[in-house]
UniProtKB/Swiss-Prot annotation:
GO molecular function (one): glycerol-3-phosphate dehydrogenase (quinone) activity
Protein name, as recorded: Anaerobic glycerol-3-phosphate dehydrogenase subunit B
Species name: Glaesserella parasuis serovar 5 (strain SH0165)
UniProt record, GO biological process: glycerol catabolic process
Function of the protein: Conversion of glycerol 3-phosphate to dihydroxyacetone. Uses fumarate or nitrate as electron acceptor.
E.C. number(s) listed in UniProt: 1.1.5.3
Amino acid sequence: MNFDVVIIGGGLAGLTCGVALQEQGKRCVIINNGQAAIDFSSGSMDLLSRLPSGEFVADFYKSYATFAKQLPQHPYSLLGKEKVLAKATQFEQLATSLKLDLVGSTAQNHLRVTPLGGLRGAWLSPNSVPTVKGSEPFPHKTIAILGIEGYHDFQPQLLADNLKQNPQFTHCELSTGYLNIPELDQLRNNAREFRSVNIAQVLEHKLAFRDLVAEIKTATKGAEAIFLPACFGLDDQSFFNQLQQAVEATIFELPTLPPSLLGIRQHKQLRHRFERLGGLMLNGDRALKADIENGKVQRIYTQLHQDNAISAEHLVLATGSYFSNGLKADFDRIFEPVFQADIVGCKDFNETDRLSWTANRFSSPQPYQSAGVAINEKCQVRKDGQFMANLYATGNVIGGFNSLELGCGSGVAVVTALAVAEEIVGA
């Protein structure tokens, strides 16, 4: 099989790159080995939340110079400020065309409410998620936080107790309660099946929609705003929007323990757009090895195509980090399993020195989290000291930064994905 571009990995980075390439007329295939990290995400995306020094980032544009000086090997530093902002804006436009219903911009980070009642910086968030701008007070004075009877992945009282500690919510009057939804009685018999996705699947049929609306109205007791777990609306926000109209109140939803409906919805919309544009998904397949000649990848072999290699003019490595097996670790080394690319990390990290992988304090940023493949300003992958002409990397498989520490994982994924798509189209 021959394609213009082979993309290894079907998560946020891989699909974003694939959509951008298909829109430019490239024939792409995505080798997808299962669920991606986006299926477990909060639905909010971060461009850059903190500097390596720990300082909170409100304005990416103003903070970039300091950031690039502190972390020159970060993909943002390699790409340059103007390109990063251009690609971030391009993704905002893509999200609008996909009807992902996101709010936010590169001009200023906002704060989103977490499932435990904290506030976390974000670049983009679903418009159904409660957010505040900086130190501004939350616009509603009375909030009803409602869980679902028997559903343990969302704790209203814990959320309320923590939410009160934030200055933006000190003026709010909070109440908590639980919804009794008889439709879910069958799920309660098996705790393993009583998850957000299962709940959404049952409620999607709307067999007792009016009863659900009445139950919410009764439980809110006239509150201006309602916080619910994200269990309403499987494929998109349409069910949630209908519920909000019927209740005639301002309803917000909060991500639950994984799997997360907010992330799953985004994943589905990206995948559907890629396939509608003519892209091919090889689901349940896994890249194993590649033939490399004269600094170029000639062909790739997968678990389901070990005898019939897949070839392409360009290849994109979008396999993610350890979570999705984009990186692996033995006792004495961290490595990228498909191309055996060069590994880099942050200061003092050595991929073959196990003692350098971890920090002494459990709560400190862990050096192994900064490991990933080495790239240049074109996102080309380095192997044996040389940059590959037709192999690019996007997302968290790239090394040299700790996305958890900096709050930049989603931003790196989409910015590098769109930058790589531009490089390939212009090649």
